[in-house]
Regions:
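Helix-terminus/linker motif at the lipid-water interface of multi-pass membrane proteins
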Residues: 38, 42-78, 93-97, 134-144, ...
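Interfacial segments at transmembrane-helix termini and the short loops linking adjacent helices
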Residues: 63, 129-160
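Helix-loop junctions and terminal segments of transmembrane helices
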Residues: 72-115, 119, 169-174
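Short helix-kink/termination motifs in transmembrane helices of multi-pass secondary transporters
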Residues: 34, 38, 42-54, 58, ...
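Short runs within selected transmembrane alpha-helices of multi-pass transporters and secretion channels
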Residues: 1-7, 40, 44, 73-76, ...
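Interhelical loop/hinge segments that connect adjacent transmembrane helices in multipass membrane
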Residues: 3-48, 93-109, 230-244
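Primarily residues marking transmembrane-helix entry/exit sites
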Residues: 26-34, 70, 115-116, 147-148
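Transmembrane alpha-helical segments of multi-pass transport proteins
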Residues: 188-191, 241-258
Length: 258
């Protein structure tokens, strides 16, 4: 596809890129940005497949355990897909605001507005699954996969934190400040491997999913929120004062239906 696109640009549009006069600082920034994005994607892939690989090495869990765990993790991917649609729409606006040197207070206000919309989506999907997910899994794949419900909850609830803060992620991408996030992800990925190895034998696939959820809360929740607040100068306490209460009503409904 890329080759066809290059041919189209050169032959049909008659556009010939020139690389001889590129400023050195621009090349340096491009390489730095691309490198951290590349490393981040690799770590993200490793993080998402760690539990499955470790579970697969345990004879008693190698077949059924992997299948059940995969079903549970599927719901995490679903809720991320629901939220990512809005993120793609607002990314150009966030980039423009960052490049225009918009104040931190205005970026925070935008983060709150978009975060509230994302919270509606995330809380609706998550609360619906928590309330009716066990019955749905039993109907979908059978009662033998009942542990997939616990796995899904363990990995889905923690992911709600970064999903309502996607604007903050777009901001640090636009500012080319992904280095810290990449290091944090590498750290929690290592912690996830160690924790999963220690817990999977004693607590099975549910233990593995709980460890993954806890490391996600530590990295994406506590550490990254500190970074957004202290280093990127976003008003994170104000954000959670406005967005956090929106989770209360869905949580009450979940408790009533469980």
């Amino acid at each position: 596809t890329r080759i066809v696109y290059m041919i189209y640009v050169k032959k049909v549009l008659s556009i010939k890129p020139r690389y001889d006069n590129l400023p050195k600082y621009l090349i340096k920034e491009l390489l730095s940005f691309s490198m951290w994005i590349f490393i981040m994607n690799i770590i993200d892939k490793l993080y998402s497949t760690t539990d499955t690989l470790i579970i697969g090495y345990i004879p008693s869990l190698a077949t059924v355990g992997v299948a059940v765990y995969s079903v549970g993790v599927t719901f995490q991917g679903m809720i991320q897909s629901f939220s990512s649609g809005l993120t793609g729409v607002i990314t150009p606006k966030i980039n423009m605001m960052v490049f225009s040197n918009t104040s931190s207070s205005e970026l925070t206000n935008t983060m709150i507005r978009i975060g509230r919309l994302q919270c509606y989506i995330v809380s609706l999907v998550a609360s619906g699954f928590i309330a009716f997910g066990q019955d749905f899994i039993n109907l979908w794949v059978g009662s033998g996969y009942s542990e997939a419900y616990c796995v899904a909850i363990s990995v889905t609830i923690p992911v709600c934190i970064p999903l309502v803060q996607n604007v903050a992620l777009n901001i640090i991408i636009a500012q080319n400040k992904l280095k810290f996030r990449t290091i944090v992800f590498a750290g929690i990925a290592i912690a996830n491997v160690i924790g999963t190895v220690l817990c999977v034998n004693a607590f099975g696939i549910v233990g593995a999913s709980v460890v993954t959820g806890c490391t996600y809360v530590l990295g994406q929740g506590l550490i990254m929120n500190w970074y957004y607040w202290k280093k990127i100068k976003l008003d994170i306490p104000k954000f959670w004062k406005n967005v956090g209460p929106m989770f209360i009503f869905p949580a009450i409904l979940c408790i009533c239906f469980i």
